[in-house]
A protein has these predicted regions:
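Iron-associated oxidoreductase/ferritin-like identity signal
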Residues: 1-162
Length: 162
């Protein structure tokens, strides 16, 4: 198995996890976010497969952050909670953070040791995209956990803004 096979396998596992998790979540916003992550990981696997068969051109820029930002902002403007209190979502976001951090490390390590410049470049880009996925998922996890941390009351003092 080559380094590209390992990377494809890693992306496919992440894609499968997000797709399965989307099926477990009852919150519509959480479901949409997991669906966006599923699609993003599928694009990564596709780019890696193209690199493997020699037809790779360029990795398209990610629109994940803009799509999720629009989803959350739209929900907030409508006066709705962007993410509900679906208990399974907390567990899913924690696992997603672990997955994204591990995938980012994998790409950074493999980019550093790659001999092929195209592979090195692709792995560097994928590492940056996985880092942005981690930041997104960790921000969502923090947003989701905020209500559990504090009770909204003047007696508890000032809280950081969401």
């Amino acid at each position: 198995m080559t380094i590209l096979d390992d990377a494809i396998s890693l992306e496919e596992r992440a894609r499968a996890y997000y797709a399965e998790a989307a099926g477990r979540v009852t919150d519509p916003s959480g479901n949409k976010i997991l669906d966006l992550l599923t699609k993003e990981e599928a694009l990564h696997a596709e780019a890696l497969a193209k690199m493997k068969d020699g037809s790779y051109g360029e990795l398209a820029g990610s629109t994940l952050l803009q799509n999720v930002r629009g989803l959350v902002e739209g929900a907030v403007k409508k006066g709705k909670d962007a993410i509900s209190s679906d208990g399974s979502l907390r567990e899913i976001l924690q696992k997603a953070m672990e997955t994204e951090a591990a995938t980012k490390r994998f790409y950074e390590e493999k980019a550093a040791s790659a001999d092929d410049e195209k592979v090195k470049d692709l792995f560097g880009k994928l590492a940056r995209q996985e880092a942005s996925h981690y930041l997104l998922v960790s921000s969502l996890a923090e947003y989701f956990d905020r209500p559990a941390e504090w009770v909204e009351s003047a007696e508890f003092g000032l809280r950081p803004e969401y």
